[in-house]
Design a protein with these regions (language model features):
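Intrinsic structural disorder
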Residues: 1, 24-28, 85
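Conserved anion-binding
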Residues: 2-3, 65, 69-127
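Hydrophobic faces of well-ordered beta-strands that scaffold small-molecule active sites
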Residues: 4-9, 31-35, 57-61, 85-87, ...
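Conserved alpha/beta-domain cores
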Residues: 9-47, 67-70
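Extended aliphatic helical segments
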Residues: 14-17, 31, 49, 56, ...
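Acidic (Asp/Glu)-rich catalytic clusters
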Residues: 21-28, 46-54, 76-79, 98-104
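Short hydrophobic interaction/assembly module
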Residues: 47-71
Length: 127
């Protein structure tokens, strides 16, 4: 079995993402592509993602809200057929369950702490 790696497509530019995908295709690894809200909401971002039928895709959206809203957010991207999608676990177990219930084949990944937060920042917000 091939190892998997995800490449972050942290841009709003479709042309940059096309280059990233072109330059990272390899037979040695299963390569997937991570997209955040900035790309999904960019001009033509959603349209581009909808055409990535043969790619492994990861929607790193960190949805964080009440259960009904998290579920609705997951439903709203269901047509894009992401393999993975993130929900912030601070939304609570019921929100995670609600998202999972409507996710179909998309696997839900719980995000606990943002990587940009160091110990000082975590203490400032009460962790």
């Amino acid at each position: 079995m091939k190892s998997k790696i995800f490449i972050a497509c942290d841009t709003t530019s479709v042309s940059k993402v096309k280059k990233i995908i072109k330059n990272t295709q390899t037979s040695k690894l299963k390569v997937g592509y991570k997209f955040g809200l900035e790309f999904l909401n960019s001009k033509n971002g959603r349209k581009f993602v909808s055409k990535l039928n043969n790619q492994i895709t990861f929607g790193d959206f960190k949805f964080s809200d009440i259960p009904n809203t998290c579920a609705s957010a997951v439903k709203a991207i269901k047509d894009l057929k992401f393999n993975y999608c993130t929900i912030h676990i601070s939304s609570g177990l019921e929100a995670l369950k609600a998202a999972k219930k409507v996710s179909g084949k998309t696997k839900i990944i719980g995000v606990s702490i943002l990587t940009s937060l160091d110990n000082k920042a975590l203490k400032e917000i009460g962790y």
